A protein has these predicted regions:
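Acidic/His- and Gly-rich active-site-bordering loop/insert found
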Residues: 1-111, 130
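Acidic/histidine-rich catalytic neighborhood of metal-dependent amide-processing enzymes
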Residues: 114-131
């Protein structure tokens, strides 16, 4: 997780930095492909590309019955996660303030908004599919 976060944080991807946003999109697309997602990159001419990652569920569709594992009603329906790939930092911020960890605190442009969220969503989906 931290290696992926470091890769993403060390890429300038401010809202006006199409090249950086496209790099983040490509990295995230590859990560989702590794997990068996069907990936589509939506190319945009003047702004950063977008990524759509789809994967079918692993259980039966929800029919109101109880889960054989827990006895609880489980919904094996759809999950939608929406994230942005850009940050609010200007070009050059990644070089001036690269990803670092001091104690239990990670810093760098986009660590909180939004790159840790990109990594967190990927790992949350991995965990859901492992259930």
């Amino acid at each position: 997780m931290l290696k992926l976060l470091e890769r993403l944080v060390n890429i300038d991807s401010g809202s006006a930095c199409k090249e950086g946003i496209d790099r983040v999109a490509t990295i995230m697309a590859r990560e989702y492909e590794k997990e068996g997602f069907e990936v589509e990159i939506l190319e945009h001419g003047n702004c950063g590309n977008a990524v759509i990652a789809r994967k079918s569920g692993t259980g039966p569709e929800y029919d109101g019955s109880q889960s054989p594992k827990t006895g609880n009603s489980r919904n094996h329906g759809k999950v939608l996660m929406i994230c942005h790939l850009d940050t609010a930092f200007p070009e050059g911020a990644a070089k001036a303030n690269p990803f670092t960890i001091k104690g239990n605190i990670a810093t760098g442009p986009g660590v909180v908004d939004m790159k840790a969220c990109l990594v967190g969503c990927l790992y949350a989906l991995k965990a859901l599919y492992a259930l």
